[in-house]
Structures are given as structure tokens and as C-alpha cells.
Amino acid sequence: MWFTKSSKDVLKEMNVSEKTGLSTEEVKKRLEKYGPNKLKGKPKKSLLQLFLAQLQDMLIYVLIGAAVINIIAHGKDGIADALIILAVVLINAVVGVVQESKAEKALEALQQMTTPKSLVRRNGEVIEVNSEELVPGDILVIDAGRYIPADVRLIESANLQIEESALTGESVPSEKDANFITTDAKIPIGDKENMAFMSTMATYGRGEGVVVETGMNTEIGKIAQILDEDNNTLTPLQVKLEELGKILGYGALAICGIIFVIGLIQGREAVDMFMTAISLAVAAIPEGLVAIVAIVLSLGVKTMSRKNAIVRKLPAVETLGAVNIVCSDKTGTLTQNKMTVVKTYTLDNLRDISSQDGQKANVDETELIRSFVLCSDASVENGQDIGDPTEVALIVLGNKFDLEKNALNTKYKRVSENPFDSDRKLMSTLNEEGGKYRVHTKGAIDNILTRANKILVNGEILPLTEEEKNKILKVAEEMSDDALRVLGVAFKDVDSQILPEEMEKDLVVVGIVGMIDPPRTEVKDSIVEAKNAGITPIMITGDHKNTAVAIAKELGIATDISQSLTGAEIDEIPDDKFAKEVNKYRVFARVSPEHKVKIVKAFKEQGNIVSMTGDGVNDAPSLKFADIGVAMGITGTDVSKGASDMILTDDNFTTIIHAIEEGRNIFNNIKKTIIFLLSCNLGEVLCVFIATLFGWAIPLVATQLLWVNLITDTLPAISLGMDPGDKEVMTRKPRNPKESFFSEGAGMRSIVGGVLIGVLTLVAFYLGIIHSGTVPISAVKDSNPATREILTYGRTMAFIVLTFSQLFYSLSMRNSKKTIFEIGFFGNKFLIGSIIIGIVLQIGLTSIPSIAQMFKVTAIDPSHWGMVIGLSLVPFVVNEIIKVISRRRND
């Protein structure tokens, strides 16, 4: 009952000092004893379970039934066909297991990458660790925006509020008090004011606590609630494909049924027609589409993670390709987030700050720097910056003037605070020295001046005049014009401790500092690339308009200050008017989280697909409202990461543009895979359907159709999904999110390709039959023993042409506009490998007598190989010619 004990007793029981925390050696011992700090998820399926799951499909049941019927009808002669059918079923199942295992591993890797980090004190230093590495006894540092990674007994709290809906169902945050103790052992979780629980979230204030329970021993672990998102749901694209597959499937089944009936009317053998119809259905129904898309998406996610973009939700990969508005924070995303104070200003005293240590300050400058340092939560320990970069810059400024943070904190102990929030744009602390109290306030200078009535001048506190206010604001504006970030500071002395809401009244303004945060060198090129791709970059920042516009001009985002608006100006514009005019603005400055939502909403109302970046607790609404919410991996809070679709591990704008490029290529790869598969399926159906209508023998037997389906589905199709992508994809406009798979002539290409493959397979069948020159094709039947060898030869020709034409045709599918000679034959090594494997397997299948007999094929005359290859190349050549003609027409 940790909540019934004092913090001192808990620390003693845990054998840990709150000032030093655990040692590295002790952490190792406790990690071995208690295990990793994580909840046990759903048990993983075994390989056998995955394998059996692949067999639970209606088409598989039909195939197995067909194999059994074949043995019953044909006895020993049907065993070979049955074995091939079962082999195809098993191979498909194995491929399915491999696909699902890969997807599962990709998701596990993704979850590992997005595991929250925690701030802990170990060996006397505050460090960031993976939350799974926490152990009982760790001293946890809590601040707004972080998830609570374990059950914690609070030992210090400052206006701390924690949202505990995961445990209590209450969305209103609970106020926490480290000094609270109760003897009531049955007190509800929501009333345990001195405790913080795993999977809850700090929304305000800060605190420290000692970890008392981890993993399954936590409150959330006891009720075995698995909070991880269900990543197994289908994406919108996969849902569309499933629907498309059903429509095509019903169509294919109808055609197969017609073929079966026509065959019976023509007096063909019922069992053979049944086998052909079933095999054709399996070959024609694109049941592999959804699985292939899942593989392409997961491979895309893996590629993006290597480029510093972690995709949390698979639908984001699809949406990325349609993004045309990228709203980005300035600090850290467009800039380097390496803040350095380069100027200070106290009344009538503007000073440049050098990089040297040991600098001297006058009385006002000393007060300015001391107040800034005391009113900061960041620290610099052993050369490691911990905390907000702006605050780190203030700590470094203090170090340059021998006003070191730890020494100041010891002398002027912090008693309470009013944490920063994005509405006030201020932070205040109350510090004590020898029974006296002083409030230190830092933040936006205009907000400070509205709360100040005095000013520090040469160590004296004097009334603040309008003239002095204007002087300060003028210097602040000049700093902003020089692209400096401006921060003001003030203080006031009080006789006793006061409430946080009383801190920011009647302040004594001291001065301002100007910080530089240089633009990222690579961002300028990325903005040019974005504009060429039809993407409009938008800067959204809390900084002053002048600072924001100066950076925006340098980066090429804006050309004039008329393209900018402040939050206050947005408030003056009616919502409907703002939505109509929003497209003309490029910079939004001094905005609150509410403004961000309003901006995203306005852009979306104009039909834009919007990406929005964010890092703070209050950014969650705008991240969720955007089509793509992008959280910062370095500076972002756990709350913003939880609300996002994608996390940037390097907080870099360029990464967003790379992710959009990858998203476009992934969608294009999926599209070309779909068109290729449908062309192949259409060719197979047409070939058998036309032959049946003509009264010819069926050109392809069941086992051959299944073999073709296996080759084309699992090799070239997946390889097309792994295509490196079009180098010119970022020179085109974003796609319309409502765009069909069959847009831009893709549907016609699919039909033309399918018709060519089907007709050429029939031509090969016909040529193979008539090569003997003695029997008309109408006389060649399965039931006629005299023509069986001729029929086998014709089927072999058709079989090879069907397979080869699909393999060659896949090369032409890599780009819908450029020929293979322009993009290069060997750009996709996986596809080349798939084609070579397919050709080798096909030649082996027809050349090895025992295998050839099973598939009812035979070796063909060497003189006919030229004919076979020539016919097989026709769909590829025609598609390449169509590209050239289409491009000339468009030009």
C-alpha cells in the first residue's frame, strides 16, 4: 500500500536516494529480478497456427475438393494432378505464412521504435532511458506531456495534473499532491493523490517520484488491459482492394460457370470441365491483392524508418502521396533547434554575447540572467543538453557569466511554480532565500509588459512608463527583424508564498534576450523540391511575425510580409472568410493550439490534403484533425506522438518531403501491381473462354493454370511492389485522393495487356496444334486418343507463351509513361531475379520428363522457341509503343 506511506518511508524501503537515484549496477540487478517494464501482449501465433490459418479459405477448400474428385474420377491417372494441386495449396500457405510473419515482425519493430522514453535520475544525473528499462526504485522525473511509464509514488509535485482515464474512465485530469497520505486502504485509484500510474498521462505541471511497480505488477497490468492499438485492421486502400477483389471474383466465377456449362453442352467431360473451371477461378480471382499490398506497405514503412520517418498508422502511407499542404513548426523543424543567446537588452543597454566563458555582467544583466536560469527546467550535465533547447540556451548563458544553475538552485530553492502553457506564453517560479521570496517570470515580452508596472534600472526598481515599454518593444522588433527569437524576463518580491495565479501580476520587467536558431541548410532545397511537386510549405510558429517572416523569406516559403498572419489577426477574421482566403497565406505567427486547429480546418475546407507538425501537449487536437499528423521524435511529448500518424526521429522538415516522395512511390507501386495482376488474370480467363466458345480443346489444364497463378502472383507482382520508384515523381502534382486505380489510362492498359496475353496464348496453342499439319484444330480433343500428343504439344506452347508473356510484360509495368529503355532494364533487381527464376522454372518444368508428365507438357521443337519468345514479347513491345505514342500526343 504505497499510498499509505510517506515518501521518506517509500524511499527507505526501496533503498534509494532521491538525489542520486540508483546506480547502473543496481539497475542491472533489479532488471534481472523484476524483468522488463512492459505488459504482456496477446500471445504470438505459432508457425503451425499461422499455416493452418492460411488454409481457412473457401477457394482452398474448393481446390482440395477438386483434387479428391479428380482422384475418384480418374483413379491413378488423377493422382499426379491431385498432388500438383495440393503442392500449390501448400506453397501458397507457406508464402502466406512468410508474408504474415514479415508483417508481424515489421509491426514489432515499429512498436519498438515508438516505445516511450522516460527521464530518470541515475548515478546522480538525469538521463533519458527506454521505458522498458525502468525498475522499481528508479527516480522518475515527470513533466507535462509525458506518459507515466510505471506505477510511481510521488515524492515531489508542482501543480501536477495527470489524466487517468485509462484506469478511472474520467477524462478530467486528477490533481496530484506528493504530501498526501491516507490510512484508507480501499481508497479508489482516482483519489490516490500521491500516486501516478502506468499508462496515464501528465497534462500539466511537473513532479518526481519513485517507481514502485513495473510491468504486470502495475495497476494496469493487474487488470491485464492491453492498451496497444490494433495494428491488424485493414487500411482504406486494402478495404478498396478487398471490395475490388470481390467484384472481380464474382465476375470471374460467373465466367467460369458459363465455361463449365458451355463445356457440358459441347459434350466435354464433366470432371475435366469442373477442374478447369475451378482452376480458372483460382487463377482469375485476385485473392493475393490484399496480401501483396500489405507487403508493399510494410516494406514502405521499413524504408521510411531508415529515412527517419516512423509511420505509426499504415493508412498514413497511402495519404502521404496525396498531401499538398505541409504545415510545419519553425523551431527545430525548419531550423536547427540549436538556440544560442547572442544579444541581451536591459533598459538602454544592448549587448552582444560572445562564446567565451567568464564574462562580466552589470547589476541589471546579472538579475536578467539569474531570473532566466532560475525560471528554467532544462539542465546541461556532462556536456549533455537535457530539456527544451530554448531553456538550454539560457542555462548556457548563465554558465558564461558564472551563474551556474545548480549553484543558483541550491541558494534560491524553488518553492512552487506556474508552468508554461501556450495560451499565456509565460512560465513563473517562486524561489526562497533566507525567508524571502521572489517570483521569476519568463516568456513573450509583450505578455510580460501587460503584466508589469515597474522596471529595473541600474539596480533600482522604478515605475514603468509607456516610453520605456516602447523602447523595449522597439528593440524586440529589431531583434525579430534579424530573425532572432525574443524572450523577456521579469520578477517581483513577495513577503510569503503565493498561489500560482497570483504570480504574474505587478511584475518588475528586467529586459529581453535575442536567440538565434539558424535555418537547417538542407531545408531550402527541400522547399524547392516541395514546390516543384505541387506541395505548399506553410510555417506555423509561436514566434513574432517579423522573426517568422525573416526565416520564411530566407527559406523561400514566403516572399512578403503580406503573406503572414498572427493569431490575433486570425481571431478578427470570420471563419468562413478565413477559409476562403487561407490559401494565400504562407506564415502564421504568434499562434495558439486553437489557431492551429482553425488553420488546418480552413485548409481542408478548400479541398487540401494537410500535413501538420506538432510537439506539445496542446498540439494533439491539430495533429488528429490533420490528414497526416506529424510528431517530433526529439522534442515531441508522448502526447503529441500518441496523436500522430508519423514521427520524425530527426525533427527535420526534409524528412517530411522524403516521406511524401516515398508515399507517392508506394501508391504507384501498388497501382502497377494491381494493373499487372488484373492484366494477367484477364488474359487467362479470355484464353480459356474464347477457346471454349470456338469449341476448341481447353488450351490450359487445371495444373498449368495453378502454376501460372503461383508464378505471376508471388514473384513479379511482389517485385513490382518493391520497385525503387520513379525519380521524377516529385515533379508531378499530388494525386487526387479519390483517384481510381484505373485512372490515367491504367484501366485501358489493363484491358489491352489482358487481351494481348489471352489472344497470343491462343495463337501459340493454335500454332502448336497445326504444326503437324495433319489434323484440323476442331478435331483435337481430350477424348480422342489419336490427337492427345498434338494437344499436349499445343498446350505446352500456350503454357510457355502465357508464362513468358506475363513475365516479360511485368518489365513494361514499371513505368506508365517512360519506356524500359529510358528507365533502365536493371533498375529493379528483384524483378529481374523474378523473371529469371520464372523462366528457369518454366524451362525445367517442360524439359524434365517426370515433371513434364505431371503437368501434361512436353519438350518443344528447338525451332519453335523463337516463335514462343517472339509471341511472348508482343504484349511488352505493344505497351512500350503505346507509351511513346501517348507521350507524343500529350507533348
Q: Where are the regions that the model predicts?
A:
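Membrane-interfacial helical/loop segments at transmembrane boundaries in membrane proteins
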Residues: 772-789, 850-859
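C-terminal substrate-binding/catalytic lobe of Rossmann-fold NAD(P)-dependent dehydrogenases
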Residues: 767-771, 791, 803
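A C-terminal functional module that forms or caps the active site or interfaces directly
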Residues: 813
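Generic alpha-helical transmembrane segments
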Residues: 712, 795-810
